[in-house]
Amino acid sequence: MDAIVIAGGIPRPEDPLYTYSHGDSKALVDVAGKPMIQWVLDALGGAKQVDNVIVIGLSPKSGLTCKKPMHYVSNQGRMLANIVAGVNKSLEFNKKNKYVLIVSSDIPTLKSEMVDWLVDTCMGTKDDLYYGVCPKDVMEARFPGSKRTYTHLKDMDVCGADVNLTHVRMATEHLDMWESLIGSRKSPLKQASIIGFGTLFALFMRRLTLEDAVRRVSDRIGIRGRAIVWPYAEPCMDVDKPHQLELVREDLARQQNELAGKTKRAVKRPVKKTTKAKHIAKAVKKTTTRAKKDVALVAKTKLKAEK
């Protein structure tokens, strides 16, 4: 499966992260010694379920690397247009592709095994769109103080994931609907006019479970949707504010230090011989000793014969 990484966002002066990006792409902001997006590419590169990685909004000049084949597509100016361009690029590689991963470039704590978990979990059914959510307790346990924004449901409080999976036809159907939803994602009232005020009111009153919400929105839009409840917080830990940037910087720096410490201890630790190795060494020693005795005996016998 191909992964489309959205990396075209450039913070404006009024954006909280502008002082960190200095007018460059948000994806290139430094996190523990790497561009933020490089951590995401490392995770995708190590995922068994990823074939190609398509980066939207950057160029080869960015100096990024990935263990999987990586391709660049220029920024199309709008979120939906970027996704459509990424899907079209994926179909260039293989017209039979049915699903793609849509990945944000600002989730640097993502790991390879989490990407594989998502693909394996989603492919148990054949839906149009798989949208991930993380329960509040999972997020707060992993990243206390992250100050995420949660949607309050009847059965749980959740925040949205930034790694999702969609059928490629979603890039060719319902485009007007998607454009409206994405364009109004900061305005609940505008979204309400699209998904229905009844659904929004039920959400506000906490009358909907996660399953109810998915069913209502799917019916309204006319797709088969499925919510994926993440057991991991990392795919939902996107960086939008300075305190979140500092949080992931500290987290990844700590992980690097722990890994370096383990590697250092492993190098210093003497290699213990296994029981089998000990037996072999003992047998070799006996054989060598016996051989030395045999040589000495032959020499002694030869000396007597000469006398």
Model-based region annotation:
Residues 65-99, 109:
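Short phosphate-binding loop-to-helix
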Residues 43-50:
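Short, acidic, metal-binding catalytic loop of nucleotide-sugar glycosyltransferases
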Residues 111-218, 230-234:
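Conserved core of the sugar-phosphate nucleotidyltransferase
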Residues 103-105:
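Active-site acidic Asp-centered loop
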Residues 56-62:
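Short, polar loop motifs at secondary-structure junctions
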Residues 1-22:
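N-terminal nucleotide-binding beta1-loop-alpha1 segment
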Residues 241:
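Short, conserved phosphate/pyrophosphate- and ester-handling motifs at nucleotide-, phospho-/glycolipid
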Residues 260-307:
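Intrinsically disordered, polybasic Lys/Arg-rich low-complexity tracts
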